[in-house]
Regions:
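Generic short beta-strand
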Residues: 126-127, 149, 170
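Structured interaction patches on ligand/partner-binding surfaces of diverse proteins
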Residues: 175-188
């Protein structure tokens, strides 16, 4: 019963890794608070693909709204409401490829999918509990400079937060407790 922290939607009709945000204006870049992270995980997929960078998008990735705006898309919803970093993987220029093309598509996307899944290990994790009772605390976990907080699992207090390599100040705060901050480094 843990929250997802990384997921992907798979579509056809283009060859690109598409990341949030998908709105508000079509043709305009719409950065999420975790824009650097979304670029990083999108590139992890695109760079492992044999020809995604030749799909008409710079480095094989695009910001959703910069490509075309939609509202109520899964990747934006997952990020905003669940803290799940979700991108849309457009896997082939043809929306409905012939069945005889599927083995080749699998071969093209197998390693990129594995590279993408490995990104789940980049970031931080921890457990927030009461020092005296050991009971989990539903604390707000914030990263200085990134306006997108997460909550730990209420049953055991654990949390996972994807972050690209860098140094971050993490703060946990909950009603009735003193806020606790730590500076951590996420390695390359």
């Amino acid at each position: 019963d843990h929250h997802f922290v990384l997921s992907a939607n798979m579509h056809g009709g283009a060859l690109v890794a598409n990341y949030p945000f998908d709105g508000p204006n079509s043709g305009s870049y719409s950065a999420s608070p975790d824009d650097d992270l979304f670029i990083h995980i999108s590139l992890a997929y695109a760079d492992a693909h044999p020809n995604m960078e030749s799909g008409g998008f710079s480095n094989g990735i695009t910001n959703g709204a910069q490509w075309y705006a939609i509202f109520g898309g899964m990747q934006d919803w997952n990020y905003i409401w669940e803290g799940d970093c979700d991108i849309t993987l457009e896997q082939h220029e043809i929306k409905w490829p012939n069945s005889n093309q599927l083995p080749g598509l699998w071969n093209d996307h197998r390693e990129p999918m594995l590279s993408y899944i490995e990104e789940v290990h980049d970031g931080i994790r921890g457990i927030v509990t009461d020092a005296e009772t050991g009971e989990p605390i539903v604390a707000n976990i914030s990263i200085q400079g990134i306006d997108h907080d997460i909550l730990p699992d209420p049953e055991n207090g654990d949390y996972y937060r994807l972050l690209p390599a860098g140094t971050y100040t993490i703060t946990a705060q909950a009603f009735g407790y003193l806020a606790q901050s730590e500076t951590v480094t996420v390695p390359l």
